[in-house]
A protein has these predicted regions:
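Conserved beta-strand/loop scaffold segments within soluble protein domains that form the structured core
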Residues: 1-223
Length: 224
């Protein structure tokens, strides 16, 4: 993709009720200085969906990205996304996971050029006995980069949500700013949320933080 793309690029992945498995592989490359909006839409009836997305964002390029997963309750969605960000590039990503009996969104991002700016937001909504998994690996390979991960979850009935997130800072990635926060809200005593934020830092001049909260609605506040 070269230059500025004025209209969103939408990739729609749909499946029928034949119970088949699909394994689409998509590669996207933004040239230096390019800008685009990319959206994935996943909606399958029955079966396994295991998409693989590889994205390369060139120097001083910008990508706004969204992924919506709303497969049926009789399906499994196991997705992997890999991104490489060039020098001075900007990535704004948003993921939403609401469908599937089992859903896992795994995202690996490498900030391979200095002054790259990356924001990844995700939300999962679970009910019945759904299982949602958001896994991220943010790798700072060069210095003066910024990353921010914002994860939100809402769980009802016997649903379970899992967030596993890592920020890795290489020895040469000085002046890194890596932030990570996960918050989950439980609407049922049977719902469960697990969070495992991690920092792996090999540089000494960085600003990194992570945190996680899990809570219920206050009955008094609901009453009033």
């Amino acid at each position: 993709i070269a230059g500025k793309v004025d209209v969103p690029i939408i990739l729609a992945f749909t499946g029928d009720d034949n119970g088949v498995s699909s394994h689409p592989v998509v590669s996207v490359k933004l040239a230096d200085g390019a800008s685009a909006v990319l959206a994935e839409w996943h909606q399958s009836a029955v079966g396994l969906s295991a998409p693989l997305m590889a994205i390369e964002v060139g120097d001083k390029a910008r990508l706004d990205y969204a992924k919506v997963q709303r497969d049926s309750a009789q399906s499994a969605h196991l997705a992997a996304t890999g991104l490489t960000l060039g020098e001075g590039s900007v990535f704004e990503g948003f993921q939403i996971s609401v469908g599937g009996q089992l859903a896992r969104l795994e995202t690996h991002i490498t900030l391979s050029g200095e002054n790259a700016d990356c924001t990844l937001s995700a939300i999962y909504l679970g009910r019945a006995n759904q299982h949602h998994d958001i896994t991220t690996n943010m790798s700072h390979a060069k210095g003066h980069c910024l990353s921010n991960q914002i994860i939100r979850g809402v769980l009802d009935d016997s649903a379970r949500g899992v967030f596993q997130g890592k920020v890795h800072v290489a020895p040469d990635a000085q002046k890194t700013d890596g932030q990570q926060m996960s918050r989950a809200l439980l609407l049922s005593r049977k719902a469960e949320a697990d969070a495992k934020p991690e920092l792996e830092i090999y540089a000494d001049d960085v600003l990194c933080a992570h945190g996680a909260t899990v809570g219920e609605l206050d009955e008094t506040q609901l009453f009033y």
